[in-house]
């Protein structure tokens, strides 16, 4: 047993070190940038160290548990712990946040506040992935929301205030349902409130009540990992935000919703989940088709990538709804894979916008000649996004396919229909992503412009892109990297579903 409070250190370090930014000397932005990157790197190394040396892979139970009394009055503890489900997203958070601070190098306006908000967001994300207490989960979920709102409303495009307001209305509306669900589960069935994950997981509820809880939590998580029809904040937000914020949004924020679905809706409410899972699969297939076909109609480059990430989230929802270990493992793999790919694509869109100052696809063209490196990386990563074999997206979508085919929950005809519709979605993906590349990079439009001299990407940008590209290839060739973390935990979750 390890008694050092590793997880508390990991959760508290970014925000407490970030608040020291305001006391740094006024010597331009260089000090602030390097300090922030140093904190992110330190945090990432610390997390990796803890997970390498203090985490047993073959143990599906919760590990590194910390439990400190916080508010005695209603049994509210600072309770942290990780298992195979949360270790992947936490490492992804560290990785993407470090790269996003590196991507935010050009930000010079109010850079202290900007970097502090990045670090505060980091703490909130790791806290919500590792909390083992429902109320603490809710608090971390909300803590993560405020920095995002400020990052959206202060740095970004012309309509950034509109999109930030839309974002906060959607997510705060979802959080009301989350709070109601947390309090309902905590106060049910005993005189003393229990907010502990472990006791709530062993608690049994009347079916009607469980369905109500399930719907409440589902609305909250459906806003966050946008499930249609609650996805409309996402394209606006991505269209206006600064691209380092976009990396955090696409890479981590969307994954919090999917993580919540698995962590709360599947673990705590298995009966209701078995009732709703066919509907989840139906919504997921509709989402793949709808978002892919909407994406090909977008003029705005960032909105097109945003719709593509809505479409990719459909696979995660299908995997969660299939209630098989294959499907759920595929969903977790897709969470990690799309975290890398979404961040990389938004970073590419942002860097090319920095150079040519155009965001509409029909005004671009011919960028491939002056910027070959950006063109190469964009081609490779959009191929990975359309699930090219050998890349991480392919493995994840394939495993989700197998999960839905081997599911005991569905009869043969629905399986054939769902698989067919998913295949159509996979055909629509190359249509929008390849036409995006064609409109941006081929042709002669910009090349004939008078000021047609553009810089290609520098070493910093190439470093960000290559360090995202390596895990994408690595997971694609050897998916057991990610699967070995979650496979025991997935079996433990699915053992609750007694009808299997």
Curated annotation (Swiss-Prot):
Keywords: Chloroplast, Membrane, NAD, NADP, Plastid, Plastoquinone, Quinone, Thylakoid, Translocase, Transmembrane, Transmembrane helix. GO terms for cellular component: chloroplast thylakoid membrane. The chain crosses the membrane at residues 4-24, 37-57, 87-107, 113-130, 134-154, 167-187, 208-228, 242-262, 272-292, 305-325, 330-350, 386-406, 416-436, 462-482. One of its GO terms (biological process) is electron transport coupled proton transport. GO terms for molecular function: NADH dehydrogenase (ubiquinone) activity; ubiquinone binding. Belongs to the complex I subunit 4 family. This is NAD(P)H-quinone oxidoreductase chain 4, chloroplastic. It comes from Vitis vinifera (Grape).
């Amino acid at each position: 047993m390890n008694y050092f409070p590793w997880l508390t250190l990991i959760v508290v370090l970014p925000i407490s070190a970030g608040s020291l930014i305001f006391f740094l000397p006024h010597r331009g932005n260089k000090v602030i940038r390097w300090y922030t990157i140093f904190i992110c790197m330190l945090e990432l190394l610390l997390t990796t160290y803890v997970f390498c040396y203090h985490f047993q892979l073959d143990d599906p139970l919760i590990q590194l548990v910390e439990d400190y009394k916080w508010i005695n009055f209603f049994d509210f503890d600072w309770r942290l712990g990780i298992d195979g489900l949360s270790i992947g997203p936490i490492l992804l958070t560290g990785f993407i946040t470090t790269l996003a601070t590196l991507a935010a190098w050009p930000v010079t306006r109010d850079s202290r506040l900007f970097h502090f908000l990045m670090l505060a967001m980091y703490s909130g994300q790791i806290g919500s992935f590792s909390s083992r207490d429902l109320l603490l989960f809710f608090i971390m979920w909300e803590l993560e929301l405020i920095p995002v709102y400020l990052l959206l409303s202060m740095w970004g495009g012309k309509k950034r205030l509109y999109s930030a307001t839309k974002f906060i209305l959607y997510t705060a509306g979802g959080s009301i349902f989350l709070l109601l669900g947390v309090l309902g589960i905590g106060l049910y069935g005993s005189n003393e409130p229990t907010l502990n994950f472990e006791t709530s997981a062993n608690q049994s509820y009347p079916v009607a009540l469980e369905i109500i809880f399930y719907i409440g939590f589902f609305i909250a998580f459906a806003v966050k990992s946008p499930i249609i029809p609650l996805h409309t904040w996402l394209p606006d937000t991505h269209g206006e935000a600064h691209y380092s914020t976009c990396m955090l949004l696409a890479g981590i924020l969307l994954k919090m919703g999917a993580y919540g679905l698995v962590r709360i809706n599947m673990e705590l409410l298995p009966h209701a989940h078995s009732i709703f899972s066919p509907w989840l699969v139906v919504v997921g297939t509709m989402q793949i088709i709808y978002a892919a076909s909407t994406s090909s109609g977008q003029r705005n480059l960032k909105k097109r990538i945003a719709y593509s990430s809505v479409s990719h989230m459909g696979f995660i929802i299908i995997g969660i709804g299939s209630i098989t270990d294959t499907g759920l493992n595929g969903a977790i793999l897709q969470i990690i894979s799309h975290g890398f790919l979404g961040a990389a694509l938004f970073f590419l869109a942002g860097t090319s916008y920095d150079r040519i100052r155009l965001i509409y696809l029909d005004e671009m063209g011919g960028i491939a000649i002056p910027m070959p490196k950006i063109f190469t990386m964009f081609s490779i990563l959009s191929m990975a996004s359309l699930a090219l074999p050998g890349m991480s997206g392919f493995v994840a979508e394939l495993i989700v396919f197998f999960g839905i085919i081997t599911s005991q929950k569905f009869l043969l005809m629905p399986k054939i229909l769902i698989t067919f519709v998913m295949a159509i979605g996979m055909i629509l993906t190359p249509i929008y992503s390849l036409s995006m590349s064609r409109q941006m990079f081929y042709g002669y439009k910009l090349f004939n412009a008078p000021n047609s001299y553009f810089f290609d990407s520098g070493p910093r940008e190439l470093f960000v892109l290559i360090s995202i590209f390596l895990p994408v290839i690595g997971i694609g060739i050897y998916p057991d990297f990610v699967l070995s973390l979650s496979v025991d935990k997935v079996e433990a979750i699915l053992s609750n579903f007694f009808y299997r």
